């Protein structure tokens, strides 16, 4: 059966990322991995201060003022050693993350997609590089619906007879792409194009649930916009091109 389908050219080819694209993905994913571990260490230091009743009067415990506070701490062992070791590890992670981000910025300047992506609300160097690396070749998606489905940001649909029940998002597809789009949506939520709709959804569904739903909705809108931008090689526009099936704004 498979041989017959292949002979008739009815078996779709499997798309594989190039070695260069795999390298780009690895760099952006490694950065996210380091950022995650840095956040864990920072939270651990904050937890140690709270456990011993130390107040943190500054907004950034790891800025200049916070470092002076940490240097003067009088903790019992082993907590003091753990806090100092955590600070050293955070400094090392800061250095490594900075190196990766500088590489991403240098490489992204000549990338075919990243400068276009950065014209959209909420997308900077890091997010743009992550989204571009995870999407790969935009021509493998025949429509914005296909790209949105690939991201896993579409709701699950359970069908029974003539009844369709929609659940949470499917989370199919690369989680790093989903992270990049959600990160962009959070930053774009204050943009004039999206702010009113975003706030309206939050008020309608409640602050906590409404914020998450509004972010997912905005991430899907940005995904649609990204498909048009990369397919037509044009910067972000507030509205879809003539003849498009939907608006690009929320």
Task: Mark where each language-model region is.
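Phosphate-backbone recognition surface of nucleic-acid-processing proteins
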Residues: 116-119, 125, 130-211, 246-249
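Short helix-capping/linker segments at secondary-structure and domain boundaries
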Residues: 9-12, 41-42, 97-98, 136-140, ...
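Glycine-rich, often acidic, oxyanion-interacting loops/wings at catalytic, nucleic-acid
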Residues: 29-116, 176, 248-249
